[in-house]
Amino acid sequence: MKNSEIVVKRFLLSLAASLAMAFSAHAGEVSVAVAANFTAPMQKIARLFEQDTGHKATLAFGSTGRFYAQIKNGAPFDLLLSADDETPARLAKEGLAVDASRFTYAIGKLALWSKQPGLVDAQGQVLQSGTFDKIALADPKLAPYGAAAVEVMTHLGVLNTLRPKFVQGENIAQTHQFVATQNAQLGFVALSQVMADGRLVEGSVWAVPAALYTPLRQDAVLLTKGQGNAAAAALMQYLKGDKARAVIRGFGYEH
């Protein structure tokens, strides 16, 4: 190798190292409370966010109702990705979130799902037949998807008939687990939990018509503890970008 080539190679390596150090020096961290239904999409988005910006997103997943209580009690989250639009608005009204930062990052879809192929039909008639022992849903007091499930069953006139068969999860992730482990033969889950790249992962599903429940408009909001955090501001902006939107669509959400 010629001396000139060696010099150029060393220069490029030095430049790359300098850029990496500068990138790292400006990287920050953001703590995010994420609605359980958005677990898989957010994990993917967080990886892309870190690759593209150098910022790290630390994620916690759970029910929106539980996060609301934790934030009220001083939990150190910078952002909330809620399963509804009411909780971010309430936090803003109570001075715990920045009202102007609120935006809808996804519109969720409810699904009736079974791990067993053929059990759930494309029209959801299985709810009328009742040919199952247990049906799972998220706690409607804590989880918007659970409240939506109750709306659907009420609309179809099967709520009281099916109530003795309920298995309730604290959040939609636990509800999905009940069905995935077949502790319940079927259950109301987020469509995003059983979809990947626009296709059903396994089992059988009824994508519940949107007319049967109040729209699951999911809002993100910057919490007051996150004000001044550059990584938090960057993630809020990233969620509106093309890469994040493509991920969100791939998991069956609208936005």
List each language-model region with its residue ranges.
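N-terminal secretory signal peptides that target proteins for export/translocation
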Residues: 1-8
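Bacterial N-terminal signal peptides
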Residues: 12-22
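Sec/Tat signal peptide C-region and signal peptidase I cleavage site
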Residues: 23-27
